[in-house]
Structures are given as C-alpha cells and as structure tokens.
Amino acid sequence: MLDLKNLQNNFDEVAKKLKNKKVDENILKKLAELFASLKKEKTALEEFQAFQNKFSKELATAEDKESLKAKLSENKSKINEQSVKVNALENELEEIAHAIPNIPDECVPVGEDEDENVELKKVLNPPSFDFTPKEHFELGESLNWLDFVRGVKISQSRFCVLKNEGALLSRALVNYMIDFNRSHGFEFVNVPFLVNGATMFGTGQLPKFKEDMYKVDDEDLYLISTSEIPVTNLYSGEILASETLPIKMTCYSACFRKEAGSAGRDTRGIIRQHQFEKVELVSITKPEQSDSVFNEMLECASDLLSSLGLAHRHLMLCTGDLGFSAAKTVDLEVWLPGQNKYREISSVSNCRDFQARRAKIRYKNEQGKNELVHTLNGSSLAVGRTLVAIMENYQDKEGKIHIPDALKKYF
C-alpha cells in the first residue's frame, strides 16, 4: 500500500507517476477530494475535542455547573458525530488506496505496454539448427512426455499431464533450481499452497485481483498464484532485528491462476497453464540493502539459465507493463527456437516498502525506531517454461531431447 502521508503531501508528483502506471485520473481526483474533506473534518473534530478538554477541567470550579455540563454534553455528541464522519472518510480513503499500485522507480522507462519495455542485454547466443526446430508441444506428444488430452479430461483446458522422461526432467529441474539458489545464499523454505485473505492482501493480490484467484468455498482460503505470497508473509506483523536482515529465501510451489485475461493466448502447449510449478526467490531487506539484493537475485536467476546453456535476455519493464506491487521489474526472457522468439521465464521485482506496509513487516533500525522493510521477489525459475526451453533448445533432427550437463546427475 502507498504511504498515504507521502501521497497527500506530494500529491501532484505522485499522481503523475501513477498516471504512467495507468491509474485512472478520476480515482486520483477522488483521492484529492477525500484528503481535503478529511483534513477539514479532522480540524473540526480537534476543535470539539479541545473544547471538551478545556472546559472539563473548569467544571469543578465553574459558577454555573449545570449550564457547563449541558454544553459539554452537547459537545460530546458533536465529537461522536464528527468521529463517525472522520472514520467513514478514512475507511473510504483506505479502500481506494488498497487498489492503487506502487509508485514506479525513477529508473523505470515510461511506456504504455510490453512493446515499450527496454532490452538491457543479451546473454549467450541462440543455437543454430540445420533443420526446422519443432515447438515443445509437438516434441512432447511424439515422445509421450506431455498428455494434453488426459489433462483436459480430468480437469479442463490449460491443464496437462507430464509423463515418463518429461515428468522426470521436471522433477530434476526443481531439485537443481533449489540447490542452485541455496548455493547463492538463499534459505530453502516449504510453505502451504493455501493461504488466508490477509496473506493475499499483504502481497497485493487482494482486493484488486480477487476475480483471478481460486478460492475455497465457505472458507477464508485461496490457492496461491505464486509462492511469493506465503513466503513474504511469513514475517507479516513482525518487528525484525536489524542484524537478521537481509533474509533471503527460496521456495518451490505449485501455482494456480485463472488466466482470465489470456483468452486465445498460448492455447497450445504448457506455456500458460492454470496450474504450474515455480521456484521462487524472496528477500526481506533494510531499505538501503534492497538495490544490491535486487541485483543478486537477478544475477542468480540469469546465472541459472546460463548454467543450463539457455540463451536469454534482460528486459526492464516500462511503467505500463509493471506489476501492481512492483516499483521496478526486470524480466528474463529465454530463447525458444520452435517459436523463434524470446519468452518470459522470470520476473525479478523490488517492491520497496509497498508490501511491507500492507503486511506490517518492520525492523528496528539503528536509532531504535520501527521502520518498514523492503520486499523483493523473483522466479528462479518457472519450471514448466524451463522444461519447454530445454525441449526446444536441446532437440535433434530425430526429435530426441538431450539433457543439459548440469542436470545429468539429477536423473
């Protein structure tokens, strides 16, 4: 959640940045009106309270006690009425603020959509083939690695069954990713895949993205769309010791997404599924640590791709493509020969204090004051898309898939 004091004190500057993130101008105008109304009503409340405090002290020595009692009683009613007004405005303001995204960092390029993201660099060269490379779903069906028909039969569209070496390769990837991330200083944690609404709110999925979530009927439980949600919230409501920071964690989980806005996109294959697996990096830092830890996380995910021999590129997301909770995001896109283009395989984001304010995660700074931490997250990596990348990059003319050297000991 945004710092409402900063929003109120620097409204024009913040509003300009939020417009670049596609926040409706009418919502920003409504916020400005609410701030003005709240200031007016709070001033009135303070005046009533000041009257009550002053004359309550004088009641014992007042000549006309009954008259003063009546005035104090009337003023108390005004305080109660005014408190209701102030609380209503604060609740309305907070409700709107919950749906407003994070402010983009100064370094984030201004742009409308993914077409205006900025390429930062390429890592490794894509392989060359003396034949036309196939897409992963062709390879997967011919090798009996991917069973789309039975996935749809037991569930619905955008579900798939992994079989034989495809399932084994997926398992090997999970173990390799966890080991790789641990070797880079990230502690492995294993968390529930079902979390409550407060946890979903803490990382910014609720209330804005409620319709995209899978919810358990009659219970305050949601299936997670990323393990960033439970891992970040492990420390919700806590005040951490300064010396424990940064906390760097890695986690494997299944992820569940309705993909409501993806009709017609990636309808074949396992690029976009309702259920998929991911190994995540999550860090909790002091404010002054978050930029360096962001670079560590980005380097970890990029090095992981390089260790598998997968060509990829770094993209800085523009304001129009930036996620709700993120102040800055760099995507890693892996080269897919079958599609002849780069596709997203990881997003590394710095959320600054946006999630920490919602989840109430603080630490005691050197002055002994409680201060909000910064939270960061990133995929290292999306398992299904890494499987796709290996299938397409390591295929041969006969349609067989060769295993990267780094994974051989995991079979």
From Swiss-Prot:
Biological process annotations from GO: selenocysteine biosynthetic process; seryl-tRNA aminoacylation
Enzyme Commission number(s) from the entry: 6.1.1.11
Catalytically driven reaction(s): tRNA(Ser) + L-serine + ATP = L-seryl-tRNA(Ser) + AMP + diphosphate + H(+); tRNA(Sec) + L-serine + ATP = L-seryl-tRNA(Sec) + AMP + diphosphate + H(+)
Family matches, as Pfam families: Seryl_tRNA_N, tRNA-synt_2b
Major localisation: cytoplasm
Residue positions binding L-serine: T226, S227, E228, E280, S379
UniProt entry keywords in alphabetical sequence: Aminoacyl-tRNA synthetase, ATP-binding, Cytoplasm, Ligase, Nucleotide-binding, Protein biosynthesis
Location relative to the cell: Cytoplasm
Residues at which ATP binds: R257, K258, E259, E344, I345, S346, S347
InterPro entries documented for this protein: aa-tRNA-synt_IIb, aa-tRNA-synth_II, aa-tRNA-synth_II/BPL/LPL, Ser-tRNA-ligase_type_1, Ser-tRNA-synth_1_N, SerRS_1_N_sf, SerRS_core, tRNA-bd_arm
UniProt keyword Nuclease present: no
Pathway: Aminoacyl-tRNA biosynthesis; selenocysteinyl-tRNA(Sec) biosynthesis; L-seryl-tRNA(Sec) from L-serine and tRNA(Sec): step 1/1
Gene Ontology molecular functions: ATP binding; serine-tRNA ligase activity
Family, per entry: Belongs to the class-II aminoacyl-tRNA synthetase family. Type-1 seryl-tRNA synthetase subfamily.
NCBIfam families linked to this entry: serS
Subunit structure of this chain's protein: Homodimer. The tRNA molecule binds across the dimer.
Function statement: Catalyzes the attachment of serine to tRNA(Ser). Is also able to aminoacylate tRNA(Sec) with serine, to form the misacylated tRNA L-seryl-tRNA(Sec), which will be further converted into selenocysteinyl-tRNA(Sec).
HAMAP family hit by this protein: Ser_tRNA_synth_type1
Domain notes: Consists of two distinct domains, a catalytic core and a N-terminal extension that is involved in tRNA binding.
Protein name per its UniProtKB record: Serine--tRNA ligase
Originating organism: Campylobacter jejuni subsp. jejuni serotype O:6 (strain 81116 / NCTC 11828)
Gene it is expressed from: serS
